[in-house]
């Protein structure tokens, strides 16, 4: 409803798919994603995309749940053996891959963390790398931005990263990433990172920064519903 009131044409709903949510990583706990097919495709005049923000969990760029075996449905019936990640991704239009817990990357080389992001981008459902500027994991910006460009995928410039009380250092990092996206021709998204309804569609901080660096409008996937959907279908089919 908030998206409709703010004149949005398209809303991507990407709740966290992460070990942060539950102590037990079962299909029952992540049933919300399994039921995405029951969500409407339009609500109050706003078209809806179904997705998730999925955690990268190791230096190989694996996504959370890739190694968690699922052999039953949410009702307990036996199903074809698969993984939790496969079950969650099945009905997602796209995924944002991001890092939250990062102890596993503590002593990693720049080459390793860079390859981690490149590997994550190669997942068939991953469209966007999320909040790179505040992940706390150093990497080769040019290499990752170039890989995203070559795959037709996106780098997120995250509103919440620029709206924090400690945002000054993060803003420098995010600005640098955005500038390299502009210079290398890589598409960006600018997610509101809304964890509450009143922040849906909020992107003032990102918008101001992009204006300041004269970011090319044609590289902003969120400039229109048609632009985002076109980029999604070009990248993921």
Short names for language-model regions:
Residues 11-13, 156-157, 188-191:
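Short hydrophobic alpha-helical runs that function as membrane-insertion/retention elements
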Residues 23-27, 138-145, 165-180, 197-211, ...:
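Histidine/acidic-residue-rich catalytic or RNA/ligand-binding cores of hydrolases
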Residues 162:
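Active-site environment of non-heme Fe oxygenases that use a 2-His-1-carboxylate facial triad
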Residues 1-14:
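Catalytic domains of carbohydrate-active enzymes, especially glycoside hydrolases
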